[in-house]
Amino acid sequence: MDALLQTIIFDRSDMKNLTEDNPMSKTSLCFNKRQEELLQLKTSIVNQKKLYCDGNDFYILQPEIRLIEKLPKGNELVRFFKDNMLKKLGYENLSVANIKSLLNELAVDSEIHIENAVFEKNMEYVNFRNGVLDINTGNFTAEVDGYFDYVLDCNYCTVDYQHSFPNSLLKLLKEPMDLENINSVSEKDKSKVILVLEAIGYILADSQQERKAIFFIGPTASGKSTLAKFIASIITPKSMVKKYTLTQMAEGFSSMSAVRAKLNYADELDVSSKKSLQLFKLMVSGGELTLPQKYAEDRDVPIRAKLLFCCNELPDLHNLQAEAIMDRMLLIGFKNSVKKRDSTLAASLYEQRDLIVSMAFDAYMETKKKRKFTDSKFAQDLFKIYSVEQNSNKNFVNDCLKLATDGKIASSKLFDEYNSYCQANGISKPLSRHSLYQEILTKFAGCAEQKKIRDPNTGRSVQGFTGIAFKDDEGESIYGQ
C-alpha cells in the first residue's frame, strides 16, 4: 500500500459521516473511499504529463511553448498546486495535510521524474513562442525536442520584413529628436540603432561568447530605463529577471537566483570593492561561481545572467584596474533628455516587439559572424577620456617632476600643482592624493615621503617629499597660478 494512503488525514467533513449505530463501519467506508479518490487523483496528475520533479524541485510544463517552469517551495507550492491543478480536477477543498502528502508521493514517482539536462538546451538556441531559433545557423523551426526554462514573449518573424527600423525604436534613439521626420535616418542614427539591436539580441540569448556587460548611459528622462524595462518584459517567466546590485550578490544575497537568471539589470555599477570587481569580471566571463551550501559541499553554478546597467555616467573606476573592466563594457549613449516623458513609448515598443526582437537576433547573428559589435564613437570618446583621467597622475609625474638629490616639495604644493595640471589638460576628475603620492614614490627610487621638511618657499615645517623637484627649477607654479 502506498505510503500516501497510510498517512491520510481525515477532513472534518469525513467525521460528520459517522453514526452512533455503526461508527467504525462508517469510518472504514470513508477511509476506503478517500484512498480510492487520492489514488485516482495521483494517477490523473501523472497522466496529464504536465507536472515533473527532479527529486528536489517541482516543475510545470507548458508543452505548446516548450516551457518547463520551476515552481516555488513550501506553502507557495501548496497554494499553486491547489489553485492551478487541484481546482481543475475538482479537489480544491482537499486539506493542506493531504496536499503535502500527495506532493511527497509525487516527488518520488518515477513516471514524472526529470533530469535537469532534459530542459537545459544548448546556449545556441533561443525559445520564441512560435518556435526555436538556432543563432549559429539562423535556422528556425516550430518542432523541437526538449524544453526550456524560459520563453521570449514574442514571435520570431519568419517572413521577410522590410529592413526599415521600427518607429518606436527610432523615436527613442534618434539624435536629436525629430519626430516629424522619424524615418529620415542619418548614418550616425543607423549605426546606433544597429548597435542597440545587437545588444538586445546578445542580452536575450544565452550565449556568453562576446563576454560583455551592457551599459545604457545618459541623463535623466533619456529613455534608457524605458528600453531596459522593455527588454526585461520580453523574458518570461518573470522569475528569470533579477535586479540585484553586485554588492548584494558579492555578499551572498540571492546569489544563486541571480547568476541563474537570464538578465540582471541595475541602476549603477558598484565596483567599489575588490570582491564586487572580481564578481563583475567573473559574471561577464560566463564561467562558474562557487556558492557555499549550508549543509552540503560548496556548489559550482554556471553563470548565465547577462548584466545590464542604466547609468547617468560611467562609474568611478579610479584606483581600480580600469583596463580590465573597460574591455568588458558595451557602452550605448542616450542623449535625448526630454522635459515631458512620452507615456505611450513603452506600449509602442511592446506592440512592435515581434519585429524589434527579430531584427535584434538578425543583427546579433551578424555580430557573431564578424566577432565584434558595431563601433561606437560614443564609447571610443568616453574610453579615451577615462584613459587620460586614469593616467593623469603618471603623466603629471613624467611631465612636471624630476629627481633631485637636495630637492624638497611640500605635499600640499604637489597636489595643488597636480590639480592645476589636470585643469590645464581638460581632466575633470583628478585622482586622489594617495594615487599621486604612490606614483611619485614608484617613479623615483631616491624619493621619500617625510612627516616634516623645511618648505623652501615658506620656510615652514610641513609634510612633504625629499629627493624630487619641479622641472622648472623655480619652485613657482609651472602654470603661473
What role is predicted for each listed range?
Residues 2-56, 84-481:
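Feature primarily recognizes SF3-like P-loop helicase cores of small DNA viruses
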